[in-house]
């Protein structure tokens, strides 16, 4: 295979596979000898079913479905209490389904990862599904999804998000996340994303842009959302808050539209109002290193870690390069995972901004350079890779805190990107509108976030983690849903299981 232009034969391909296996083993042994953790691939097991007979499968299905519903029911008192406060503008004489029952149905729709209103009508109204669901919710009456859509069109859908924040607040109050905190702060990652786009304007709130279409341009209408999630070092990402872009929030006279930074200010205000006393650390991407954002964080008494890109804040970069020569003790080397890391920081950098430089912020800047070894994709050669990460911080760095602030906090900003990707590509249909009524569209979005919120503690719970590891997250949700649409459940067993004491414990 020395000639790159020649196709390898089967023998050479087989030989390369063997070489790659041996090289991989040698690399892992080397990393182990150096005290590095090469990590384990989180692939699902490739084996036949472990159930010996139908009885074993039934027991597993009953246990999984019931424990999933127990976790949901543990949240139900908070959900129902808050949902009951939402004003129902419908005519009471014509109401068949209560508001809270309709919204619980909407949450279940996303807990089971139903992909559309048509699928909800088709799948969630099947007699066997309803019979099984009534084992957990005896009074539930499944409506047509259009009924839910009409309700979402007329109620204050922002109150649905308030339900989500109330449920998160309850978990925080019960100290469910206390073991994952870093320096007793809750890390909130904030990131913007596009929900969907259309070529026609279907609501006046849509943002617009010009896109190329061959030799011409055309107007495209889109919906962007700024999301906030609680993120933790174990990878858990808890949906928290959403802020929609809105054409009316921009300057309509100058046609300067709403943007992510404006949405951040609105979201930050609501987040502070919802959690006024919570110790929060926000982690933000390279769009946010600017004075107004830091002002908002400091006004709210939030810690922050913000990605700093090469061309952002040139005066801060210049100050860093000058001061690092005088602060040679501000260096730290460590191993993390399979990587060698070198940290270098400068504290107390003055950042001047605003009209005539009248405003100033004192910030702290760190650079993390890291190297690691991995196998080349097309050979058995071991390559050395390198990367660099830069952040600015609210608090000064030291050898005692640089690992926590960078590796355990700032890097987990990626958790929200992973969480949004899960909602877009792994069952929650983030990019599906569900309705072309703006209010209803937002309502379905908030219900989706609530459904995701219910599922996250379930897949990290002690009672379900084994089956989640067996089937994967989507496989587990599909396993539960398949159980509920078939005659797997034994009513006396389920009733006894539901009657036992239950406490949510996370791994």
Segments and roles (model prediction):
Residues 2, 67, 85-86, 125-128, ...:
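A short, flexible helix-boundary coil/loop motif
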């Amino acid at each position: 295979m020395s000639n790159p232009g020649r196709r390898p034969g089967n023998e050479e391909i087989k030989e390369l596979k063997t070489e790659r296996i041996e090289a991989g083993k040698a690399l892992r042994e080397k990393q182990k000898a150096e005290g590095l953790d090469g990590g384990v691939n989180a692939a699902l097991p490739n084996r036949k079913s472990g159930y010996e007979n139908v009885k074993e499968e039934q027991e597993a299905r009953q246990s999984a479905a019931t424990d999933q519903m127990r976790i949901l029911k543990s949240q139900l008192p908070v959900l129902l209490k808050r949902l009951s406060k939402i004003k129902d503008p419908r005519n009471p004489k014509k109401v068949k389904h209560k508001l809270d029952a309709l919204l619980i149905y909407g949450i279940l729709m996303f807990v089971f990862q139903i992909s559309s209103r048509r699928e909800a009508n088709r799948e969630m109204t099947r007699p066997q599904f309803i019979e099984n669901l009534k084992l957990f919710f005896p009074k539930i009456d499944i409506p047509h999804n259009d009924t839910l859509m009409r309700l979402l069109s007329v109620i204050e859908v922002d109150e649905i998000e308030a339900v989500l924040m109330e449920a998160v607040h309850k978990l925080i109050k019960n100290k469910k996340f206390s073991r994952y905190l870093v320096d007793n702060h809750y890390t909130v990652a904030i990131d913007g994303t596009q929900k969907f786009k259309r070529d026609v304007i279907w609501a006046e709130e849509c943002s617009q842009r010009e896109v190329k279409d061959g030799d011409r341009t055309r107007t495209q209408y889109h919906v962007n959302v700024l999301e906030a999630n609680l993120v933790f070092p174990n990878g858990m990402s808890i949906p928290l808050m959403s802020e929609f872009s809105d054409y009316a929030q921009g300057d309509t006279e100058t046609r300067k539209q709403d943007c992510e930074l404006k949405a951040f200010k609105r979201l930050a205000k609501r987040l502070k109002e919802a959690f006024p006393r919570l110790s929060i650390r926000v982690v933000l991407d390279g769009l946010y290193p600017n004075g107004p954002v830091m002002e908002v964080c400091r006004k709210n008494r939030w810690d922050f870690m913000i990605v700093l890109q090469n061309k952002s804040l040139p005066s801060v970069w210049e100050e860093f390069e000058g001061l690092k020569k005088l602060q040679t003790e501000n260096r730290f080397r460590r191993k993390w995972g399979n990587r060698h890391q070198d940290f270098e920081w400068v504290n107390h950098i003055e950042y001047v901004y605003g009209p005539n430089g009248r405003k100033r912020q004192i910030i702290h800047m760190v650079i993390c350079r890291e190297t690691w070894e991995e196998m080349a994709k097309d050979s058995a050669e071991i390559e050395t890779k390198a990367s660099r990460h830069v952040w600015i911080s609210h608090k000064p760095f030291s050898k005692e805190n640089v690992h926590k602030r960078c590796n355990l906090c700032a890097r987990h900003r990626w958790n929200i990107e992973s969480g949004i990707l899960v909602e877009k590509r792994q069952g929650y249909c983030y990019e599906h509108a569900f309705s072309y009524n703006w209010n209803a569209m937002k309502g379905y979005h908030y219900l989706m976030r609530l459904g995701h919120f219910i599922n996250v503690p379930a897949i990290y719970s002690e009672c379900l983690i084994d089956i989640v590891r067996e089937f994967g997250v989507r496989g587990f949700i599909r396993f539960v849903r398949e159980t509920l649409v078939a005659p797997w459940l034994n009513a006396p067993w389920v009733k006894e299981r539901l009657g036992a004491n239950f406490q949510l414990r996370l791994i």
